[in-house]
């Protein structure tokens, strides 16, 4: 009986380690890293609606209204050459009327994700960018994949932009590409 309990404890412990090391266990709007965009849209719909803001065409993105009431907006990215349209980035956004609520939401989600992934996040960082203030925390996985929880506080002069809370799931390769200034 003791051996059975010891084995059970080891198995359960191992499951939490593997869960913490795999970003694909987390879903945004029932979408996860590695799943196919073709499960939602036809190739024609994807190609007609993909974003054109990247100069470097290694990856492509598409944005659409959330499939659930949890988010306002969803953005996903895939390697342009991938005929299966496997997602390498899944981002959910919730528009914010009060930026302080957004900052509180970062703290709430940080606690939930710390427990879910069993990973300690980075310190909260804020820095100005050309559009306003960007505040975020990251959950970094051993694989190099990353979850970013953030708030964009846009300056008043950008009246076409609304402050937004975002959760982004990104693979290591996609993050590396984003950091190479593909715009």
Protein language model features and the residues they cover:
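Compositionally biased P/S/T/G-rich terminal and signal peptide-adjacent segments
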Residues: 61-86
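Non-cytosolic coordination micro-motifs
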Residues: 20-64, 88-183
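Sec-dependent N-terminal signal peptides
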Residues: 4-17
């Amino acid at each position: 009986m003791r051996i059975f309990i010891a084995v059970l404890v080891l198995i359960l412990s191992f499951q939490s380690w593997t869960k913490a090391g795999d970003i694909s266990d987390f879903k945004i709007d029932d979408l996860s890293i590695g799943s196919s965009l073709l499960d939602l849209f036809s190739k024609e719909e994807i190609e007609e609606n993909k974003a054109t803001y990247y100069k470097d065409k290694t990856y492509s993105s598409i944005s659409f209204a959330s499939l659930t009431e949890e988010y306002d907006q969803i953005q996903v990215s895939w390697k342009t050459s991938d005929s299966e349209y496997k997602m390498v980035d899944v981002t959910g956004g919730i528009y914010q009327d009060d930026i302080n609520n957004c900052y509180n939401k970062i703290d709430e989600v940080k606690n939930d994700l710390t427990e879910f992934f069993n990973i300690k996040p980075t310190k909260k960082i804020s820095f100005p960018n050309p559009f306003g203030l960007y505040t975020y925390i990251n959950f970094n996985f051993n694989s190099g994949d990353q979850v970013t929880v953030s708030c964009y506080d846009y300056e008043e002069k950008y009246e076409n932009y609304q402050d937004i809370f975002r959760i982004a799931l990104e693979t290591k390769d996609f993050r590396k590409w984003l950091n190479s200034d593909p715009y």
